[in-house]
Amino acid sequence: MKHNFDNHTFLASCEHDADKNVMHITFTNGKTYSYGDCSHDDFEAFKNAKSAGKHYAQIKASKGQYQP
């Protein structure tokens, strides 16, 4: 499942891999980072957050970058 952030300063999109419970977040500079232990509920909360930037900071702090 994928979500595009329209007109966001630094977030371009996020995608959730339900099989691996991983969220891939792509930035406007083209780089993609992956975060593990992210449920579908985490994905929904991120895409519907009032402030996607603040929510991203929470994901980054609590999940850590995923290393496949």
Go through the PLM ranges and name each one.
Residues M1-P68:
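Acidic/histidine-enriched, beta-strand-rich ligand/metal-binding domains
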